[in-house]
Amino acid sequence: MGIVDAVGWAGATAAVLFMLVFTVDGWTRTGYRPDYHPVSALALGGRGWLQKANFIVCGGGIAIGSLALIEVSILLTLGIGVFGMALIASGVFTMDPMRSYPPGTPAGNPASFSRRHELHDHAGMVVFATVPIAAGIATFTPQLSDPLRVYSAVIAAVVTVGFLAFGQAWENDSARTGLWQRLTILVGWSWLAVLLAISA
């Protein structure tokens, strides 16, 4: 296995591991509702270190994994690299406690947000924006196979819709906010894992 293969598989593994960790962690957290609370809320509380590490380690793995695509498309490499770095930033700058999590936190949003929370929001916007952008780039990358390009086109559309639905659910404090986010992550990160694995 060469260096390109190794970094590609590292990135693919990181994308899958990220989903696995937040899924298991969310199922086993007291007071945490996966269908309602966002993934980022797992970085709060006594076990918050686990999701912080998940953001940072998996973000780093994906950023490194993007290098497997450098001979395929520099734009695609940059897009996925930025995604990975934004994921790292999401772990460094955590969201504020809100909406009944961690347990004992009042329902709803706080009267004001910390600078750390604002930086987390900015990083999250980059994370969710770069997936459909990268998928769109992949759609028009002739070095990729036709099936992968079609798959990428579908992902670009689906993740865009999912991101908008999640954003609307968040603004409305919907009981299904976490569900929309998780579905969007599952679709987008799975595509990313497939892309990096194929490129390895």
Regions found by a protein language model. Give the residues of each.
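Hydrophobic, aromatic-enriched alpha-helical segments typical of multi-pass transmembrane helices
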Residues: G2-P38, L42-A200
